[in-house]
A protein has these predicted regions:
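N-terminal entrance/gating region of PLP-dependent enzymes' catalytic architecture
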Residues: 2-148, 435, 439, 468-473
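Short Gly/Ser/Thr- and Asp/Glu-enriched loop/turn motifs at secondary-structure junctions
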Residues: 146-148, 183, 408-413, 445-451
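Conserved PLP-enzyme active-site core in the AAT-like
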Residues: 160-329
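Active-site C-terminal subdomain of aminotransferase-like
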Residues: 270, 295-402
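A short linear hydrophobic-aromatic micro-motif
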Residues: 402-406, 438-443
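Conserved PLP-binding catalytic core of the aspartate aminotransferase-like
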Residues: 405-433
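PLP-dependent enzyme catalytic core of the Aspartate aminotransferase-like
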Residues: 446-481
Length: 481
């Protein structure tokens, strides 16, 4: 397309796209090189960006240079820099250049992979990469596509939990709830430390938050199986229908590891669907020495983990596995006439539209494929081990300082700690650190006490970043206590 023709059509000409694309790659590479110069937590006030934007959209198209100038002037000040090596908040959402390139290619191809027929490579690469991960994480063979189960990429673990809940609901009611709705008797179970998405899933699925039982935890904040069993018995005695339990490998607050094997025994005794949410800590199973966290996963009906947290694959990318794919498909499949095609009717292909809530789906497998091929299992293990090593080093400094204490055992790469002076002091320490822009921490409450969380998992975080963070924490504590 000539420049004149592109101008008449309002499209960007291929030559300009080539030039701007190279500029964008340079900008992203430069951003990563200078990311430490920005305050980690955005310092803007609510409404600041909108006040700087024009009230109406432009009538005439604007130049790419003008857009990028506004990125620097308006957007960057409003960014919290998740890819900063000084980002220690929440759980990581790390990234890598191979993943970014895979995402770019996915956007460039511009496909919609709802059916095998709408892009066979999208479906088959996803199936294959998910099978690779079964081997890489030593997951049960039943989760591979060669057996009765299989894997699919969801957007987040929240969607995986909802899909698991729906499949369990339909298995428990022999598909009646899909036709007639819920009757209020179904009851689901998880721990008090489980992710909030379980409550949202219970609401969406028609189970109701009042029918989601939060089981108490032990001193390490892991679910207590004996309390689960007792609650199930009470619910049955009261005319309820227990049908689903979610165990967690790496709880959001403290990275606690639920005793999956014992929970699975309770689930099987009572005929419940067991879902295992390993959103954060599933990646640890790349390393044989950390596979103790997954003891009992072979007994689960479904499982998920997030490469977009700790496997250098940009958001969003959650890997969801089921032992029996037929149960998932029966719960979610709807086939209108306009989606019928010979490949689907042959029964020889996978249509991932039946494995998720939406119809449409992106080509997420490309970026995951790029990441695995670039790093190899060896490279991924190296970084996981390094992050765990850094976290354990940080935990040792906390133990050695009489002003601080650990709030929970640190099994992997999250350290929960607090100053001994109490909640107000810890809140002030965190607020001062975050306002400084030097690093970013978040908090939780454990044992009803405010607790600081040091989450180590960004792609570029090294020992000197963790050392500096610890020094800054001690400095702020000394300034206020």
């Amino acid at each position: 397309m000539s420049a004149d023709k592109a101008k008449r059509s309002f499209h960007m000409a291929p030559d300009e796209f080539r030039r701007r694309g190279k500029e964008m790659v340079d900008w992203i590479a430069d951003y990563y090189e200078r990311v430490e110069t920005f305050p980690v937590l955005s310092q803007v006030k609510p409404g600041q960006l909108r006040a700087a934007l024009p009230a109406q959209a432009p009538e005439r198209g604007e130049s790419f240079d003008a857009m990028m100038a506004d990125v620097e002037r308006l957007i960057l000040p409003g960014i919290t820099h998740w890819q900063s090596p000084n980002f220690f908040a929440y759980f990581p959402s790390n990234n890598s250049f191979p993943s970014i390139l895979g995402e770019m290619l996915s956007a460039g191809l511009g496909i919609q992979g709802m059916l095998w027929a709408t892009s066979p490579a999208c479906t088959e690469l996803e199936t294959h990469v998910l099978d690779w991960l079964v081997d890489m994480l030593a997951l049960p063979a039943e989760f591979a596509s060669s057996g009765p189960g299989g894997g699919v990429i969801q957007d987040t673990a929240s969607s995986s939990s909802l899909c698991a809940l729906l499949a369990a609901r339909e298995r428990a009611t022999n598909l009646l709830t899909n036709e007639q709705g819920c009757d209020g008797r179904l009851v689901a179970y998880t721990s008090t430390q489980a992710h909030s998405s379980l409550e949202k899933a219970a609401k969406i699925a028609g189970i109701g938050s009042a029918n989601l039982r939060a089981i108490e935890v032990d001193e390490s904040f892991a679910m207590r199986p004996e309390l689960l069993s007792a609650q199930i018995a009470r619910d049955r005695a009261n005319g309820k229908t227990p049908f689903f339990v979610c165990a967690t490998i790496g709880t959001t607050s403290s990275n606690a590891i639920d005793p999956v094997r014992e929970i699975a025994a309770v689930s099987r005794e009572h005929g419940l669907w067991l879902h295992v949410d390993a959103a954060m800590s599933g990646t640890a199973a790349l390393c044989p020495e950390f596979r103790w966290t997954h003891d009992g996963v072979e007994l689960a009906d479904s499982y998920c983990f997030n490469p977009h947290k700790w496997m250098f694959t940009n958001f969003d990318c959650d890997c969801f596995y089921v032992r029996d794919r037929a149960a998932l498909i029966r719960a979610l499949s709807v086939l209108p006439e306009y989606l019928r095609n010979r490949a689907t009717e042959s029964g020889a292909v996978i249509d991932y539209r039946d494995w998720q809530i939406p119809l449409g789906r992106r080509f997420r497998a490309l970026k995951l494929w790029f990441v695995i091929r670039h790093y190899g299992v060896e490279g991924l293990r190296h970084h996981v081990r390094r992050h765990v090593e850094l976290a354990q080093q940080f935990a040792s400094w906390v133990r050695a300082d009489t002003s601080f204490e650990l709030a929970a055992p640190p099994p992997l790469n999250l350290v929960c700690f607090r100053h001994r002076s109490g909640d107000e002091a810890n809140q002030r320490i965190m607020d001062r650190l975050n306002a400084s822009g030097d690093l970013y921490l978040t908090h939780t409450r454990l044992g009803d006490r405010l607790t600081l969380r040091m989450s180590i998992g960004q792609s570029q975080t090294e020992l000197h970043h963790v050392e500096r963070a610890w020094q800054r924490i001690r400095d702020e504590a000394a300034a206020i206590v």
